[in-house]
Amino acid sequence: MTRRSSGYWRVTINHPPLNIFGPYLIPQLNEAITAIETDDQVKVVVFDSAIPGFFLTHYDFLAKVEDPTSLPPGPTGLQPLLDILVRLSRAPVVSIASIRGRATGVGSELALACDMRFASREKAILSHFEVGAGIVPGGGPMARLPRLMGRGRGLKVLLGADDISGALAERYGYVNRALPDGQLDEFVDALATRIASFDKRAISETKRFVDVASLPPDYELAPE
C-alpha cells in the first residue's frame, strides 16, 4: 500500500506470477481494509496490480483446505473474504478498481466491492468461471451483478462462465468505463486526485446515502 497523499492511497496487488488469490492474502487485505476504515484523512483508494496480465485471479486450489476455513469470521460476522469485501463497500472512503489483465472469481468480486471500476479496453478480462468448474461463487456476485447490469445479464455472466472483455464489460455495466490501455492510468489517477481534493465529510456522507439505496444486505451476499 502506498500513500500518494494523505487523502489518496493505492493498494497494488503483487503476488507473482499470476496474482492468484489464496488464504495468505486474506490477512494482507484485512490489514489494508482496516487501515482504510480507521484513518481519518484518506478519502480515496485505488486497487491495481503490479503483475502484467493479471489484476487478481481465483483461487489457489493447492492451498490446504483448512487454511481459509480455519480463519475466524470478521467484524461483520461473515466469513473472512466476504467480510473484507463488505467492509470495503461500506467504508467511508471511495474505492476504485483499475483493471488491467484478468479479474476472475475473487478478482471480479474485489472489483465489484469497489465503488467504481475502470478497465483497459484491450487488456482487461473479467470472469466468473465458477459454475463451469462445478462450484458456486462465494464472494457475493449473485447479489452485486444484477444490481449493476440487470438479472438477465447477471445470469449470463455467472452461468455462461466465460470471459468478458473490457469493452463488453462497459456495455453491460460491469465497469463504469473501458478506456484505451494507454489512457487508463492517467484517467484513474486524475479522478482519484480530484476526489481527494474534496471535503472528506461530504464524500463519506454522500457515499453513505448511495450505499443505503444501492448496496445488497448481508443476507443476500451470504444466503443460507
Q: Language-model segments: what does each one mean?
A:
Residues M1-D48, P52, V86:
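Conserved CoA-thioester-binding segment of acyl-CoA-metabolizing enzymes
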Residues F47, D60, L110-L112, A169, ...:
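Hydrophobic/aromatic residues within transmembrane alpha-helices
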Residues S49-R87, A103, G134:
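Glycine- (often His-adjacent) and acidic-residue-rich active-site loop
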Residues I84, S98, T104-L158, F187, ...:
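CoA-thioester-processing core
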Residues A91, S98-I99:
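Structural motif
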Residues L110, M116, K156, G160-D162, ...:
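Well-ordered beta-strand positions
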Residues A119-A124, V175-P223:
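C-terminal long alpha-helix characteristic of the crotonase
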